[in-house]
């Protein structure tokens, strides 16, 4: 069994074990990948202030996210195609999150369906939805989430149109994967992955096929996907979705203060400062650089979370210190899942937790809820001094 001490250990194993198209799907951004890179590198510009001769006993990372008790302020982000990284991937990730005591967020574009995950877990999970044109299908998604006892809906608002992701286009990404000479040759080298896929019936988008109008089988999925997303989305429509759902609402994809205020005004319970992991608008601010201005705009009137770029417990701790009430990991848990299945997700969470807990103690705190900006050296102009 390999010794796992950091998320990078899992990424290296993951790269060896999954087909290239699915590795590239996770480990890439849009256009030049500037934002994808800066999501991580901007965390490196924040430095910790180490304190000594401080009692470090009885450390706790326990906190809450939208009223839910969590073992640490970290949730598993919604990641599409998770069940292509590892057979029954969403179920395995949800189980690992439940056992660890952190929220799991299921993507609409998951391979395992809402019902699949609900049948294989006991803790309520969160369900992410995109803004789609078909109101009837949206209502049925909300109804299915309610029936599965999902405790919150996460609406992604930054995918009205799809970002230009060069690697996905060149790889012909799909679920199940398109069979070309190159993809077949590559998949034949991924024996563990292939055996897992042969042993499951879940190989298509489980929330879509057989549920969306005109998508009775996988052959019609590509046509539906090309037409389903709503480019005319506005805040009134988001307000309508909140009414259709009727429960706790998290809005994901906020990167500018004006939109944070709009999310507050439509009644969201929380927002996620996110640029979709650098997979939508390349050249946008990293999430951690965008965070201070958003916090200045909304204060404590709404819970502010952050995703994009978190690859360690130190990154998550820095985000919390900057003012985020919660954080999300997507790629970090995906590496673990593709590398070692459910155990790999658990390993990823253990790594994140240990890094967060020890770093917090070095900074003079034993309770995550007391952490603030005072534990950081923040460079002048970090959040930007822009003309507009």
Q: For the regions a protein language model found, what residue spans apply to each?
A:
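Glycine-rich active-site/cofactor-binding loop and its immediate structural neighborhood
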Residues: 70-109
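A gly/proline- and charged-residue-enriched helix-loop-helix capping module
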Residues: 99-120, 124-138
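Alpha/beta enzyme core
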Residues: 81, 95, 120, 136-306, ...
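An N-cap/entry alpha-helix motif that binds or orients negatively charged groups
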Residues: 1-67, 176-233, 369-388
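Short, basic, glycine/proline-bearing loop/turn elements
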Residues: 75-81, 124-130, 222-224
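Short, conserved beta-strand segments within well-ordered enzyme catalytic domains
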Residues: 47, 62-64, 73-77, 103-107, ...
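Active-site loop-helix segments enriched in His/Asp/Glu that coordinate
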Residues: 82-91, 112-124, 140-141, 145
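Alpha/beta catalytic cores of nucleotide-metabolism and tRNA/nucleoside-modifying enzymes
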Residues: 1-44, 289-307, 311-388
């Amino acid at each position: 069994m390999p010794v796992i001490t950091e998320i990078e250990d899992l990424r290296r194993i993951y790269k060896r074990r999954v087909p290239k198209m699915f590795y590239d799907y996770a480990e890439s951004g849009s256009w030049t990948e500037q934002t994808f890179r800066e999501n991580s590198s901007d965390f490196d510009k924040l430095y910790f202030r180490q304190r000594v001769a401080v009692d470090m006993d009885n450390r706790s990372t326990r906190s809450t996210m939208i009223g839910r008790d969590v073992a640490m302020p970290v949730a598993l982000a919604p990641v599409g195609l998770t069940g292509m990284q590892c057979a029954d991937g969403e179920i395995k990730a949800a189980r690992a999150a439940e056992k660890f005591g952190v929220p799991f967020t299921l993507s609409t574009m998951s391979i395992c369906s809402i019902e699949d995950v609900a049948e294989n877990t006991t803790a309520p999970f969160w369900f992410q939805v995109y803004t789609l044109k078909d109101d009837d299908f949206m209502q049925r998604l909300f109804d299915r989430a309610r029936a599965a006892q999902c405790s919150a809906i996460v609406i992604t608002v930054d995918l009205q149109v799809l970002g230009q992701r060069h690697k996905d286009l060149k790889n012909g990404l799909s679920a199940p994967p398109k069979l070309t000479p190159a993809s077949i040759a590559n998949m034949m080298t991924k024996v563990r992955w292939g055996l897992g896929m042969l042993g499951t019936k879940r190989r298509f988008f489980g929330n879509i096929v057989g549920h969306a109008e005109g998508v009775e089988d996988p052959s019609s999925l590509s046509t539906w996907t090309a037409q389903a997303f709503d480019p005319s989305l506005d805040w009134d429509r988001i307000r309508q979705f909140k009414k259709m759902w009727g429960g706790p609402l998290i809005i994901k994809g906020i990167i500018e203060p004006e939109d944070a205020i709009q999310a507050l005004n439509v009644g969201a319970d929380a927002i996620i400062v996110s640029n979709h992991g650098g997979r939508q608008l390349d050249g946008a601010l990293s999430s951690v650089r965008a965070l201070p201005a958003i916090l200045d705009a909304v204060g404590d009137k709404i819970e502010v979370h952050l995703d994009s770029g978190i690859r360690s417990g130190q990154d998550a701790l820095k985000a919390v210190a900057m003012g985020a009430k919660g954080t999300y990991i997507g790629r970090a848990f995906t590496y673990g899942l593709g590398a070692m299945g459910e155990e790999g997700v658990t390993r990823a969470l253990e790594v994140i937790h240990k890094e967060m807990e020890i770093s917090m103690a070095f900074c003079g705190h034993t309770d995550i809820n007391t952490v603030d900006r005072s534990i950081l050296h923040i460079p002048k102009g970090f959040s930007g001094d822009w003309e507009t």
